[in-house]
Amino acid sequence: MQNYSKSEKAFKEAKKVLPGGVNSPVRAFNSVDASPVFMDHGKGAYITDVDGNEYIDYVLSWGPLILGHADPAVVNAITKAALKGTSFGTPTEIETELAKLVIERVPSIEIVRMVSSGTEATMSAIRLARGYTKREKILKFEGSYHGHGDSLLIKAGSGVATLGLPDSPGVTKGLAADTITVPYNDIEGAELAFQKYGEEIAAVIVEPVAGNMGVVPPIDGFLEGLRELTTKFGSLLIFDEVMTGFRVDYYSAQGYYVVTPDLTCLGKVIGGGLPVGAYGGKKEIMEQIAPAGSIYQAGTLSGNPLAMNAGFETVRQLTPQHYDVFRTLIKRMEEGLTEISARRQVPLSINKAGSMFGFFFTDQKVINFDTAKTSNLEFFRNYYREMLGQGIFLPPSQFEGVFISTMHTEKEIDKTLEAFDTTCKILRG
């Protein structure tokens, strides 16, 4: 039995000064009927809470830590940079070096602008698309989360889905009217939207692998169909690769699926665990951004040297071979979960993409937000608490992706499968 007394005390204090006791809603553990676990430190594939409980970590700070916790080279890069000064508000050479690395690895990006979060990246890309096309409407997909920008919270996933909110109060009717939504993986729905609004649509923004309703890969022809539609109607195709960038493949999801968007949004991995975002794409589009062009975007800490050094050192270390290992480990996890769930008579549907995967307690194949919502949420809540008690730290929401790092091995996968078997035995009797 795990002891969480220090975490409970810390949460009680946090609620006095933070809304709901946290700085991001899903961290409150409300959807799993538990109090949040306060972490103290991490190393490799493991994380340890303030009570001294150690866990195999499948959250990895919600995706950024693809090299695991406290990677020595990343920590060293941050330390050396901090000793020189934490921020200057001027250009630094490391910004250019990280930009070159991103351009080398992400097929669609010819020029890139660094920002401070994934939300800032998607908001800026949307503004750029509207300014470039002189149009106002945006098409997005139900259950996809593109950050907390107002126009992108319409029928969103991630924490919005976790809380069961269709939209967020505070989003104006005008913004909602300019946001068109269709189900993810529904190319026919997208075609109908373009038939009705085609000349008004500035851009389609899509996660090439939806990671905020669980993990939902694109069906055959979906991304290709969006590329054809946007080209036909003169709209821009924006890939939100904040989560999938450098997680699905060495060349990101667009490289794996061989579909090239006009603009790409990045975050998470390219900051190595520090706040960062980026958006980039075709030179002719990106040069519309100030000071080269008239579409404004700026940021006090954009391209700050700590995040740039952490991101550069993270991306630099990744090799194509890492992704072969990721797929082998995820396959081992999938096969184990499938065997155990069948033996324990627990309905289970599994999706995977590179170093991320998702599982749903349902008999249905999960291809969009509606099918994701068929998962047995009551079973998930009980399952989550049992797994946590056995030292497995998973996202405290059915609608979040699960991640592995270069520090996860067969040992961690097998321990997780043992815990899953024990949990299913307890819950199924």
Swiss-Prot record:
Its EC number is 5.4.3.8. The modification N6-(pyridoxal phosphate)lysine is found at residue 268. It is found in: Cytoplasm. Its main location: cytoplasm. Pathway: Porphyrin-containing compound metabolism; protoporphyrin-IX biosynthesis; 5-aminolevulinate from L-glutamyl-tRNA(Glu): step 2/2. It holds the Pfam family Aminotran_3. Gene3D superfamilies: Aspartate Aminotransferase, domain 1, Type I PLP-dependent aspartate aminotransferase-like (Major domain). GO terms for biological process: protoporphyrinogen IX biosynthetic process. Transmembrane segments: none annotated. Its cofactor is pyridoxal 5'-phosphate. It catalyses: (S)-4-amino-5-oxopentanoate = 5-aminolevulinate. GO terms for cellular component: cytoplasm. Keywords: Cytoplasm, Isomerase, Porphyrin biosynthesis, Pyridoxal phosphate. It is an enzyme of class 5 (isomerase). One of its GO terms (molecular function) is transaminase activity. Homodimer. Belongs to the class-III pyridoxal-phosphate-dependent aminotransferase family. HemL subfamily. This is Glutamate-1-semialdehyde 2,1-aminomutase 1.
